[in-house]
Swiss-Prot record:
SUPFAM superfamilies: PLP-dependent transferases (SSF53383). It catalyses: 6-carboxyhexanoyl-[ACP] + L-alanine + H(+) = (8S)-8-amino-7-oxononanoate + holo-[ACP] + CO2. Its EC number is 2.3.1.47. Pfam families: Aminotran_1_2. Homodimer. The gene is bioF. Gene3D superfamilies: Aspartate Aminotransferase, domain 1, Type I PLP-dependent aspartate aminotransferase-like (Major domain). Keywords: Biotin biosynthesis, Pyridoxal phosphate, Transferase. CDD domains: KBL_like. The lineage of its organism: Bacteria, Pseudomonadati, Pseudomonadota, Gammaproteobacteria, Enterobacterales. This is 8-amino-7-oxononanoate synthase. HAMAP family: BioF_aminotrans_2. GO terms for biological process: biotin biosynthetic process.
Amino acid sequence: MSWQEKINAALDARRTADALRRRYPVAQGAGRWLVADECQYLNFSSNDYLGLSHHPDIIRAWKQGAEQFGVGSGGSGHVSGYSVAHQALEEELAEWLGYSRALLFISGFAANQAVITAMMAKEDRIVADRLSHASLLEAASLSPAQLRRFTHNDVAHLARLLASPCPGQQLVVTEGVFSMDGDRAPLAEIQQVTQQHNGWLVVDDAHGTGVIGEQGRGSCWQQQVKPELLVVTFGKGFGVSGAAVLCSNTVADYLLQFARHLIYSTSMPPAQAQALRASLAVIRGEEGDARREKLAVLITRFRAGLQGLPFTLADSRSAIQPLIVGDNARALHLAEKLRQQGCWVTAIRPPTVPAGTARLRLTLTAAHETQDIDLLLEVLHGNG
């Protein structure tokens, strides 16, 4: 088989399974509204959970940062790309979340991969929740360590895997809020079992940070858990992009030496770091509290209005509200019907989710209004 035949076969297989992904160029893709092809839709596909992507204070901070520092960092943080803006953001994040250090990364994917590839050796073992993000599972699969997966949120299964002999160290990997189901990990129980077996815990709280807990400190703070490594991202609750790893001083020093994604990548622009500092100020303050409270009210209203629909609603109290449809073609058809009626919704299909669990991944944000939720419910009931 030639290269072209190999590529064509892979694409044909995706088409046959109604699993071929495509992108839509949008004029606006975050916030309450999505604009595409000169049409405006209520946006139920954005991760901008607090509606901060268009916040004037954050936009102003980015502009001022660009005027002060320029539009790029100019290099890796190990060379010339670590600015006083980066340093200030790291210090503020560490203080906010109760850690000694924070290290910035260009994306959550990079942060997750950096942690696992830097920490793990051949004699070690990674024990990951089966539904962990692709960045975590891919890094674990490619690392020299043994990878074992435990049944989703099943602490007893995790304990059995940790109890089997391992010549090296054990790293338990999970998420705070799961990206495709919207449910939460029992972090206190997971940490207890991990500590009983002398392991370390990594929590990716991409979808919890900024959105839940006191001052938006996320899943771990809410459950009174402090993992050895906490990954937070800035493309969701913060409304910007990028990520950080929170850890001890010694682990931070170690990652600065061995995390290749950090060493060999150009740092985020200092202006972006300034915007993130402004976003953090909103998240921690009274306005952040108000946005989280509004989002919680909208989530409750949405779930209460779904009674009678012939879909499986995931057990989620987060901004992620998946409607499990099952069949790929049906999920695509339903997403298109909703778009025709003014609601932009994305169909998520295998391999992103397990076979037979194609879904509409609905996301609610603090930018939405009550009437937006009511319209979405009306459209869903009309197409159920």
